[in-house]
């Protein structure tokens, strides 16, 4: 984690990360393995689908709202999530299902059924205890 997309940062570290992630992405896609992208991983894959980003640094905690959709429909529609990002997702390709958004309309969670990809813009692994809602969401992928 902690990297930015090459269109925003062209450091050697980011170039290396992008190269490695492209290899993993292509392999998983070819083998039809479900994929989970967290923060950078979500933006990395979303970027392959003509996504619009904005420089909106979000660090700390904020609430997101889950939308009613076919992939994930929790009883509690509001979730507080952590955030450690420099860029936000403004607009996704219409073939991508938006699962949750921030009050500023940026996308916080999405699903790409064609490649079985779940993108989360928060870090479920950074909580002291793994939360049930995060577990349920990830479990839907597999």
Can you say where each PLM-predicted feature lies in the sequence?
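Acyltransferase
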Residues: 120-142
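Glycine-rich nucleophile elbow surrounding the catalytic serine of serine-hydrolase chemistry
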Residues: 38-46
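Active-site metal-binding loops of divalent metal-dependent hydrolases
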Residues: 2-3, 42, 124
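Flexible gly/pro-rich beta->alpha loop and the following alpha-helix that scaffold active-site loops
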Residues: 1-36, 49, 139
């Amino acid at each position: 984690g902690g990297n930015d997309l090459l269109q925003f940062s062209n450091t050697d570290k980011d170039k290396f990360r992008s190269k490695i992630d492209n290899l993993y992405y292509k392999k998983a896609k070819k083998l039809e393995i479900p994929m989970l992208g967290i923060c950078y991983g979500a933006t990395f894959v979303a970027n392959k689908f003509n996504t619009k980003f904005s420089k909106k640094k979000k660090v700390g905690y904020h609430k997101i709202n889950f939308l009613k959709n076919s992939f994930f429909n929790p009883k509690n529609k509001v979730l507080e999530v952590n955030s450690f990002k420099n860029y936000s997702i403004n607009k996704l390709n219409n073939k991508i299902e938006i699962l949750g958004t921030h009050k500023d309309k940026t996308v916080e969670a999405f699903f790409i059924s064609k490649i079985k990809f779940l993108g989360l813009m928060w870090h479920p692994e950074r909580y002291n205890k793994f939360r049930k809602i995060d577990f349920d969401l990830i479990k839907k992928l597999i």
